[in-house]
């Protein structure tokens, strides 16, 4: 699955590649990714920060084999900075044709832990009310990162989302067997299927990181930067998406097919 729900972080990345990062350029990039990568993905995660029409066009652009996931997180993020906190947009209406909703949660070992659990519960309930799947994405902020990843999975996985989206242990750069070992710890505390994200992982390390995560119990990946970062410098990313991102996505899909845990196994466990 491909993530294309980056907002101010995408604006920053485009600006770093020399572009005037207007809302229109962000919209064009998101829809180019949907159009070119959708046929090779099982899912596309997108946001409607820059207009509901972006989601509607993305739904029309991808084939039926690619489900569209909508981010319903409101991000507390200053330009050029990381996301500090999130809240849930408990919307009453959704575009037709959505497969799932997604919520980013910034996990910290602080006095707001119970508050974040409650927000996650409300998110899962929101998706259920709308008859779509729920994808929960905790990102930890803690000096003991590997401990925090497992602790967040234990705490927030208990809200039982349809799918849990998790950071790769060791930033994907460690020994594959060690990464797989950490992933088995994550798998042991989660009651639902889970996948890894690519934020914080060098794109060159991501294929081996996905394989290690799958050996540790993951069912795949939901990644953006590792797939399309190489296209950011182009005024029109279409050709690079076809020449660079499609083969990269196909490589990752082959790894998941070979090593990923079928999501139904974990869902039924």
Give short role names for the model-derived ranges.
Residues 24-39, 86-101, 112-124, 129-133, ...:
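Alpha/beta enzyme core
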Residues 104-108, 169, 199:
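Short strand-loop junctions, especially beta-strand C-caps/beta-turns
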Residues 1-109, 160, 192-193, 204-220, ...:
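Alpha/beta catalytic barrel-like cores
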Residues 138, 168, 198-200, 225:
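Active-site proximal loops enriched in glycine and acidic residues that flank catalytic Cys/His/Asp
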Residues 135-143, 195-196, 261-268:
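Aromatic-lined carbohydrate-recognition surfaces of secreted/lumenal glycan-active proteins
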Residues 68, 127, 134-135, 194:
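Hydrophobic beta-strand scaffold residues
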């Amino acid at each position: 699955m491909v993530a294309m729900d980056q907002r101010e972080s995408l604006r920053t990345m485009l600006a770093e590649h020399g572009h005037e990062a207007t809302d229109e350029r962000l919209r064009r990039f998101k829809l180019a990714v949907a159009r070119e990568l959708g046929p090779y993905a099982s899912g596309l995660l997108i946001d409607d920060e820059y207009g509901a029409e972006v989601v509607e066009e993305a739904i029309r652009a991808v084939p039926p084999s690619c489900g569209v996931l909508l981010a319903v997180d409101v991000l507390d993020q200053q330009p050029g900075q990381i996301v500090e906190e999130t809240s849930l947009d408990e919307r009453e209406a959704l575009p037709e044709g959505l497969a799932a909703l997604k919520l980013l949660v910034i996990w910290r070992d602080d006095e707001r832990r119970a508050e974040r659990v409650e927000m996650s519960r409300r998110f899962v309930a929101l998706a259920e009310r709308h008859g779509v799947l729920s994808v929960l994405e905790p990102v930890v902020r803690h000096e003991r990162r590997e401990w925090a990843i497992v602790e967040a999975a234990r705490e927030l996985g208990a809200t039982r989302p349809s799918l849990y989206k998790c950071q790769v242990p060791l930033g994907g750069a460690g020994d594959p067997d060690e990464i797989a070992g950490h992933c088995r710890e994550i798998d042991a505390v989660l009651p639902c299927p889970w996948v890894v994200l690519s934020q914080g992982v060098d794109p060159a390390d991501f294929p081996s990181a996905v394989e290690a995560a799958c050996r540790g119990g993951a069912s795949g990946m939901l990644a953006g930067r590792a797939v399309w970062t190489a296209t950011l410098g182009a005024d029109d990313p279409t050709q690079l998406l076809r020449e660079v991102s499609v083969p990269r996505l196909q490589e990752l899909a082959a790894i998941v097919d070979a090593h990923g845990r079928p999501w139904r196994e974990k869902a039924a466990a």
